[in-house]
Amino acid sequence: MVPGIFASGKVFIMAFLQIAFHSNVLGMASSLDAIVPQSQNGPLKVLWLLHGLSDDHTIWQRRTSIERYADGRNLAVFMPNGARSFYCDIPGGLRYATHMAEELPAIVRSMFNLSDRREDNFIAGLSMGGYGAFKLALRHPDRYAAAASFSGVLDIGSFYRMMERDKVADVLGDFGCRNPDGGPEDPRALLSKLVADGAEIPRLYQACGTEDFLYADNISFRDFARGLGADLTYEEGPGSHTWLFWDTYVQRAMNWMGL
């Protein structure tokens, strides 16, 4: 026996699956990467990992050791393809928010033995995906126990204006308005409404590198959320908008979630 590998007395073997399927919501073929235990103890907990603007669903598996981090946790990890959608239902276009929050959970639950309990479902992402994770969790607070954002685009108005300046037309079209501040795509507005309604809010974990170009926006969101009394854990450390930072903090977030 190799020392350390089987110290617990159990052998955990993870399967990596690349799933191609037809999305009725998007009206086209799409893809999803999944990491699941080959054997399990009851229904699996679920972690959704969302990618950033310049990547796709394969990036978490290629740039981190997420399969190793998920090992032994009785956890399924799903990495969907959100394209450059900002996880929005794009006006006159593809409905990625509905795809992510409604269609994909139903698809994977038909394939795997997954828990549908709120306390067993989690969502996280980086950059655009960090924005998407917070937005989807705050839009559907009854479905997720916690959400994590790594270097997230959390001041969506500021980011929109930057994209407008740089003439990134596809991103500007995602939100369907000239200024998404305070609207249904703004995590601040969603959080404010939940607090005002006295609703149960998912726990939030936020991490950003101190050299990240989104650092000031992340500090602004942190202070805003704390001002509302939201249950938000914030961490920062040396680093910029890179996988070296995200690979470290996805591990910290998974432990914080209790996975």
Placement of each model-derived feature along the sequence:
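Non-catalytic cap/lid and distal C-terminal segments of serine-dependent acyl enzymes
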Residues: 2-259
